């Protein structure tokens, strides 16, 4: 098993006001639940999990927990960095009691295994295909060259997803250099580094609606971020690996501070078209207007 996702539905016995970003509350909850169950997690370096924000049944982010109301969040774990069997045992229980005395009442825990499908590594007819796809972003920020990128950059999205896939397969076919960057990564005989470069060159954003915000992380720390939706178009011969990257992004998130609930995304659609037929459609009758 490469990855494990737990979707946890819960409620509380008394009101909890989240004075900072709710991902900090969830990060503390996940860490304490694991440690109380004897599941060891590293305190320095990359965390073996990512989490979503706290959401209501309609998928809206909340900053206040009210008794009698249900909420949910998702935590995704990398099984080469943590004992995923132990994770299941830690979270499948009636309640979680935090060191601060707060009690979270668990209503339901749903587990899902992550298995990227890389079979074949290319489209069935070896033709280049056009993929139209969309993403709904919850608060997200991409790091790049000591800057924070607060718009839905396709290059940052695809690079982040590729690095996560490499991290998932770190002890198998993927090789990383000492700095943790992708270096000649091979998945099923595919040059992943070259693939993502080609993918970035052949992906364009065709529309987006986003808003920027500043996320308070506590202790005076503030992180710039954005949220909203974006539409992209990609041309590739390797549909299988491209789909695997979208699946990784949706399962583990993208960007920075994912263990604090940032970078949670939902792939809204993906439509695959044959490049030849798409060109024929584009060459059809057109009309110009104001």
Label the predicted regions:
Residues 1-290:
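RNA-interacting cores
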């Amino acid at each position: 098993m490469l990855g494990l996702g737990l979707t946890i539905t819960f409620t509380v016995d008394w009101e909890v006001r989240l004075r900072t970003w709710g991902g900090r509350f969830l990060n503390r909850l996940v860490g304490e639940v694991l440690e109380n169950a004897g599941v060891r997690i590293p305190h320095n370096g990359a965390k073996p999990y990512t989490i979503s924000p706290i959401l209501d049944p309609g998928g809206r982010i909340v900053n206040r927990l009210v008794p009698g109301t249900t909420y949910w969040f998702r935590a995704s774990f990398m099984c080469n960095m943590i004992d995923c069997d132990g994770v299941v045992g830690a979270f499948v229980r009636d309640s979680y009691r935090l060191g601060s005395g707060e009690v979270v009442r668990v209503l339901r825990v749903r587990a899902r295994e992550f298995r990227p499908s890389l079979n074949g590594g290319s489209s069935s007819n070896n033709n280049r295909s056009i993929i139209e796809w969309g993403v709904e972003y919850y608060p997200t920020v991409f790091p790049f060259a000591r800057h924070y990128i607060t718009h839905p950059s396709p290059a940052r999205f695809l690079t982040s997803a590729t690095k996560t896939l490499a991290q998932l397969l770190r002890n198998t076919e993927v090789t990383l250099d000492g700095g943790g960057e992708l270096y000649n990564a091979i998945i099923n005989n595919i040059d992943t580094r070259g693939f993502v470069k080609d993918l970035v060159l052949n992906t364009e954003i065709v529309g987006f609606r986003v808003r920027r915000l500043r996320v308070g992380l506590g202790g005076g720390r503030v992180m710039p971020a954005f949220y909203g939706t974006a539409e992209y178009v990609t041309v590739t011969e390797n549909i299988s690996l491209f789909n695997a990257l979208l699946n990784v992004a949706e399962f583990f998130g993208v960007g920075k501070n994912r263990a604090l609930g940032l970078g949670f995304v939902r792939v809204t659609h993906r439509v695959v078209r044959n490049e030849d037929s798409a060109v024929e459609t584009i060459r059809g009758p057109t009309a110009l207007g104001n």
